[in-house]
């Protein structure tokens, strides 16, 4: 057998990888009738809120399990271990990754966390997980914003809680010295509007204090394999609807590299990436 020919193990692994999104879609579709029965008219009267409740119900079940991935945990824990000072987490969901902050909070390295989570259906559990690691919302140690990462959502939300001087959607004036020591996102940038990613990265940079870090663990577009690209494109017709506006063609990695605004930026694939994975995960550490 030629050394360049795929082995049966490789073919099996690739088939499993290609079908893994279908398993997640199945979970999501199981929660669709449950959400319809719970809110029988909402799909017609408020489709956006219905989608949020649908995904919220799914993620309360699926999020904690996915947060325990043995392959991903070392990368994610390593990023949270770098967090310090005042932290902004973009898209914390249920707060399932909050456990990685326990030591930093106890040691005083992390003083306050702001969680920008656009899905209000997840806020109750998010606040509960914050209390569990010693970030008491009642003491101002944890602040939850009903906001996404895009400037038009995030900046006004920060203004409403008194953390940003202007309600303008631009993160320019008034943010020269920054607000946060650390901005972190874990598997959430895929749900942001991908066409706004350059503006999102620019806003993140503006909100960081000098020397602050933007830390991320995200799945992004796989541009290296034609079959995977076609499969991701086909899935893309239903994937965002069923998976909380998640996109398989994420581009945060490209956006930070192309921005040129960070003093240093290290973005690399995880060691598990085989070149053909549908979910291509990258780890990023960018310093202002």
Question: Locations of the language-model features?
Answer:
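A short, conserved alpha-helix within the catalytic core of class I
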Residues: 191-203
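Short conserved loop adjoining the S-adenosyl-L-methionine
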Residues: 151-177
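A conserved beta-strand element that flanks and buttresses the S-adenosyl-L-methionine
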Residues: 184
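C-terminal alpha-helical "lid/dimerization" subdomain adjacent to the S-adenosyl-L-methionine
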Residues: 55, 66, 217-280
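C-terminal lobe and adjacent flexible extensions of AdoMet/dcAdoMet transferase-like proteins
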Residues: 281-288
